[in-house]
Amino acid sequence: MSQQVIIFDTTLRDGEQALQASLSAKEKLQIALALERMGVDVMEVGFPVSSPGDFESVQTIARTIKNSRVCALARCVEKDIDVAAQALKVADAFRIHTFIATSPMHIATKLRSTLDEVIERAVYMVKRARNYTDDVEFSCEDAGRTPVDDLARVVEAAINAGARTINIPDTVGYTMPFEFAGIISGLYERVPNIDKAIISVHTHDDLGIAVGNSLAAVHAGARQVEGAMNGIGERAGNCALEEVIMAIKVRKDIMNVHTNINHHEIWRTSQTVSQICNMPIPANKAIVGSGAFAHSSGIHQDGVLKNRENYEIMTPESIGLNQIQLNLTSRSGRAAVKHRMEEMGYKDTDYNIDHLYDAFLKLADKKGQVFDYDLEALAFINKQQEEPEHFRLDYFSVQSGSSDIATASVKLACGEEIKAEAANGNGPVDAIYQAINRITGYDVELVKYDLNAKGQGKDALGQVDIVVNHHGRRFHGVGLATDIVESSAKAMVHVLNNIWRAAEVEKELQRKAQNKENNKETV
């Protein structure tokens, strides 16, 4: 009987480090819910000691997620571990993941310490974490460049201290697959108490072999794989979980292991992460790229038509990609839209049917037929923008031409007040942004602008993703419309609402901190 490989997702911790703009607490929760639906065993959702905002988001996710184990990261520092436990304690069960560097280079130049001191510190911190939970994971940072004998000493001591998962990271993506397999095998040979812990791996893609390293480690005995959806992460990224999961499934004949992942949710989870994180998936990306199941060669097309297995080792349906696209019209009722969303795998909690149906009718009136990809895009945008809005686009008009300076007039609802402004700009989008900035008085600098078609043909929806810099912080906004200028305006309004909400959250955190201080003084 095959053994289970535990899937540990770090999209919301290590993966987020690659983003140009930090995710809001609501966006993180959306991703966490998608990961739970896909069936990840463990999700690492943040580094609570790093900021009050991260603490709050970890706490919110820990309170909400029920079917996956929620985990938080902590250095081998007392405060880190205590704060992580404080954020996680609202969960029924949780994991604390603590780490310290073990390679000679890191010990000498970063920690300015010795291996013996590192072991002593690791043991103390694992024991401290065990005071809060039985589920403690310990990582040997830069394990890939740590001599195996040294690594074995650290691992044995951490297990004796109470760590139930030992993670072996290739922190800088340096190790080759055969080397990494050798490290795992070497630990099994050298560590007498290794049967008391799960051996985990965490690989990076600097040399393009993160997935290969993880699979080689599993073949050598590792039983947990850490990674991120779509491989997002620092530098060249993390191990792409969807690739590991499907490799284990497709090649079960030689891997002889399995995961508990609902692989039919892979495609939708991948899309959720891509859209929320504003990181488009390359067309040639394995498993989830738009070209992953495309066949352009005549020979291949003929072979697939005769038997799909001639050129397909897995099906689009196996990852939840339904290739049958149905269309709805403005005559389709609310029940028909809801039924189609259910057929595509969406639950009632994934969208607001009232908001979705209103947006559907507006789009159907414009383009006649609404396809599955239109519905999914509308559902995503409405989910992103369902929170109370301080700013709302009331009206806009643009005049521009090949030789004229673009002029825009904009009306914006700011709370209960309607404000209007006009401005010139270098093109219609810039003119609208100048007018909006005049209305709000927000000092924002546009640092990224992306336009992607959601669908096919001249009436396809255009999704605009922007990133702006505001007082040293970056914020992401998204807009969707059949008109590019309108979607650009909506994206800017979305950004401004995100900035406004972030300021409100900051005020609330400051209020709580002040109340805490006042209570201390009273006592």
Curated annotation (Swiss-Prot):
Quote the gene name from the UniProt entry.
Answer: leuA
Assembly, in brief, is:
Homodimer.
Question: According to the UniProt record, what class of enzyme is this?
Answer: transferase
Q: Give the source's domain of life in one word.
A: Bacteria
Which pathway does the database say it acts in? Amino-acid biosynthesis; L-leucine biosynthesis; L-leucine from 3-methyl-2-oxobutanoate: step 1/4
* UniProtKB keywords: Amino-acid biosynthesis, Branched-chain amino acid biosynthesis, Cytoplasm, Leucine biosynthesis, Manganese, Metal-binding, Transferase
Q: Does the keyword Transferase apply?
A: yes
**E.C. number, please?**
2.3.3.13
Q: Which organism is it from?
A: Salmonella newport (strain SL254)
- Per the record, GO CC terms? cytosol
| Cofactors demanded by this protein | Mn(2+)
Keyword Manganese annotated: yes
| Organism taxonomic ancestry | Bacteria, Pseudomonadati, Pseudomonadota, Gammaproteobacteria, Enterobacterales
In this chain, the stretch annotated as Regulatory domain covers: 392-523
Residues binding Mn(2+) are: D14, H202, H204, N238
Its function, per the record, reads:
Catalyzes the condensation of the acetyl group of acetyl-CoA with 3-methyl-2-oxobutanoate (2-ketoisovalerate) to form 3-carboxy-3-hydroxy-4-methylpentanoate (2-isopropylmalate).
GO terms, molecular function: 2-isopropylmalate synthase activity; acetyl-CoA C-acetyltransferase activity; manganese ion binding
Extract the PROSITE patterns matched here: AIPM_HOMOCIT_SYNTH_1 (PS00815), AIPM_HOMOCIT_SYNTH_2 (PS00816), PYR_CT (PS50991)
Catalysed reactions, semicolon-separated:
3-methyl-2-oxobutanoate + acetyl-CoA + H2O = (2S)-2-isopropylmalate + CoA + H(+)
Occurrences of domain Pyruvate carboxyltransferase (ranges):
5-267
For this protein, the record's Gene3D superfamilies field holds: 1.10.238.260, 3.30.160.270, Aldolase class I
Q: Which SUPFAM superfamilies match?
A: 2-isopropylmalate synthase LeuA, allosteric (dimerisation) domain, Aldolase
Broad class of the protein's primary localization? cytoplasm
Q: What name has this protein been given in UniProt?
A: 2-isopropylmalate synthase
Q: Which PANTHER family match?
A: 2-ISOPROPYLMALATE SYNTHASE 1, CHLOROPLASTIC-RELATED, HOMOCITRATE SYNTHASE-RELATED
- What are the subcellular locations of this protein? Cytoplasm
